[in-house]
Structures are given as structure tokens and as C-alpha cells.
Amino acid sequence: MTVTTSIQRPQAPRLRFLASFKPKSLADAVGTCLLFLGAWLVIFPFVWMLSSSMKPADEVYDSNFHFWPETFVGGANYYGVLFDQPYLTFLANSFIVCIGILIVQLVTAVPAAYALAKLKFRGSTILFGFVVASLTIPINVTSIPIYLGLVKFGLLDTYFSLMFPFFVSVFAIFLFRQFFKDYPDSIIDAARVDGFSEIEIILRLILPAAIPAVAAFSVFSVVAHWNDLYWPLIVVQSQDKMTAALSMLQYQSEFDNDYGRTFASATVVTLPMVVIFLFARRLFIRSITMSGIKG
């Protein structure tokens, strides 16, 4: 009696990779095409930016787009951005402003969110309603009174003036409250029985469990204020306090626009944010799924 044994050979990695893109139905095929189209629409501006940063100004808006420039001036463009101007100072200013804002936002938002989520007091629901309503107020509405106050106290062109309007983040309070509400009340009650103060409960119990939410908000906050141009354009009056985003305007004037260096500057400004997101993406995605922000 002969027994035939068939041995299944594992698929090569390349075949498995290609098989993952094989649509199972027409709907899957259409969905895959739409996803590829959406991904390309998101990626193409960065491709354009990187390509333009290596071209001379007259080639940036050539009608025949090609990624690799006919005349390569990428080295000159990036050298001019990094060394002809104190660009490292601009980057340092942006880091100082973003980190300073983030620290104060966390210090103010975490206790406020904990109080709204776990402490029972009269008017808490109404207070939370005001918090949600405050999300609809843009900074443009409050910029004039804040600016006049900074002028009166002589605080223009300082790190404080760049950070002050953003010290309290209503979005952070809302995000952390949604996250804290899911934390078990029984653990908090047990901690109180053991003699924990409310601050100790926040620092030793709540905050370690909220690391994904903190990471997600940190990405939101740092990216938003790193890219901010509106407020620095109002309060910065010297090159010493100029941020990286604001410094890109130096390559544009009424009579001349150095587009090559402008795009090189934009690439240098964008790179740190891409790196931060790549390192924090898992915590970012986890916080979206665990908090109240769901599609």
C-alpha cells in the first residue's frame, strides 16, 4: 500500500504580498482603487515639495513636471536655507514654543478633565457644555484683545507672547474627559480609602493609564503650533524669535520669489513632524480607538 504525502510549500513573501492586493469582489476592487487614489492625493503635495526643493526657481512651475530636476540645485537650496540664515535658531524657537505650550496645556487640561469626568459637583454638566461650546471659538476672535494686552505689558516679541493664547486647550480637556470617564470608579474609590489625594490619584493612577491619549494630543498640539503662521506673524518683531514656519516668508518678496529655497525650507520644517508622527503613530491610533473620538 502506497501512501502519497503532499507537502505544501510556503508561499514566497513576494507572492503573499501581491496576493494581499488581489480583490475578492468588484466592491473590493473599487475600494482599493479609491484608497490608492486618496493616498496619492495625500502624498503628491509632499512629492511636489521635495522635487521643487531641488530645482531652480524658473523650473519649479515648468509646464512639463518631472520629479528629478533638469538643473540640480538641491545642495545650494538646502545649504542656503540651513546656513545663510540662522535656521537652527528658527527650529529651536519652534521647539521651545511647541514644547512649552504642550507642557502648560497638559498641566491645565488633565486636572480639569479629571474633575469633569470623576468629581461630582453642582453645575458640572453645564460647565462641560461651556467647554464643548468653546471649541467653536477660533483664535481670530480673541487675537485682538490678547494682542492689545501683550502690547500694554510690553510682552511682544517674546516666547511668552507666542505661547500665551494656547496655554488652555479646550480640545485637550474634552479628549481627556472622554478617556477618563472609562476609568473604573472602584479603583479610584479604593485609592481614596488608602489615603490617596486627588492629585496622587491623577499622577499615580489616571495619568499612566492615559498615556495613549496624552500621546495623541501631543501630536495634535505640536503639529498645530509647529505649523502655525497666523499668531507668530502678529507678535514676532525680530529674527531672534522667528519660528521655522514664519521664516519661510523670508524667501518671498514683492519683486522676487525664490521658490526653490521656499520649498527646501518647507521640507526642513515638515521633516521633524513626520518623524514625530512615525514614532507616535501606534499610541495615536490606540487613543483614537479607546477614547470617545470614533467615526
What label would you give each PLM region?
Residues M1-P23:
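Short, Lys/Arg-rich, polar N-terminal cytosolic tail immediately upstream
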